[in-house]
């Protein structure tokens, strides 16, 4: 039954993430906060892969059997995890660059707010989708008998735009501080 679905990429990603977790816990080489963020990133990616498989399976085989509230929970958690990756990667890079010491207190606090506000908006859009579904469909819907349906409006694109924003900001800050980064830090950033 699983072979009828196109799970190749999800299963491959899941296996890579499990291998990463296994070898990661064999030897830790980065400080504790960075270690926590890195392990959280890998756990979130693993959760994304599992939820993607569960969502696809529910759409194809269990459309009428799984309660809609469980489907909403799966989809909202999946999109939250997908968008959390870019935020956590930005935090991971900023911790490795030790920006708290390089920036003034005011500038560093601005950077924190700059990271939190778009992410909070993104999560708000994702988790309001089931609440506002009957009034105004946001990014996606769960339709009885059909399953997951992507809405063709701007609300579907906003979480992806916010994710891209985090990756671009991280890339720009890495370029700005490229001369200050040691070889080992560059290696850690390229995980």
Residue spans for each PLM region:
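Hydrophobic transmembrane alpha-helical segments in integral membrane proteins
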Residues: 1-19, 154-161
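Short aromatic-rich membrane-water interface segments that cap or initiate transmembrane helices
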Residues: 1-3, 69-81, 145-159
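Hydrophobic alpha-helical transmembrane segments of multi-pass membrane proteins
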Residues: 8-29, 33-92, 112-131, 189-191
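Membrane-interface helix-boundary motifs at transmembrane edges
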Residues: 25-39, 94-111, 174-185
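Hydrophobic transmembrane alpha-helices
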Residues: 47-55, 118-139, 154-191
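Juxtamembrane/interfacial segments around transmembrane helices
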Residues: 62-69, 91-97, 166-177
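Membrane-anchoring/interfacial helices and their immediately flanking loops
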Residues: 88-158
